[in-house]
Amino acid sequence: MNLFFKVIFILITSKFIKVNEDIVFNDLSFKRLDFTNYKRIKSFIFKKDFYRLNNNNVDNFEFLNYSKNLGGKIGINLSRNNIFNWYLHNKSKIFYPWIDDYTSKRLINIIYNYDFITSSSNENEIKTLKKIILVHVYRVIHDFKYRDINEITSYDIIANTLSNLILGNNLN
């Protein structure tokens, strides 16, 4: 039954989520400590189509922190293009990489690096990124409701709280 709900959810979110221009993702820098393994990310970030790798640093978008430190147009384009390509490659999948707390980590990393990613983006790219964020927001909220208490991580709690705040939901 859970698989059925996931399939329905994926179909609904991929077709019917509309980008609300009133939702703002700028200046949401809440991350204080950086636990990114830069040596591991450096080993794959310059490879072609690295978004296809089954690597947790790719699937939770930890590479965004490395790209941000790399800076410049190269880092921005590398980040943005790989987010878009990763999403196109994985948006219809039901299980991996939409398991555990990967969705929550991705959402947190996208939000934290949003200003960096969009600094040289055109309107269409910003709209696409907002749609990707909203898919993650709805996915986090949906998965949080159906997760067993023992499966919830601190990333899930942060992402769920952030998701509800973004959507303006009452947290009571």
Model-derived features with residue positions:
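Extreme N-terminal leader/anchor segments
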Residues: 1-53
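Aromatic-lined, polymer-binding surfaces characteristic
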Residues: 54-172
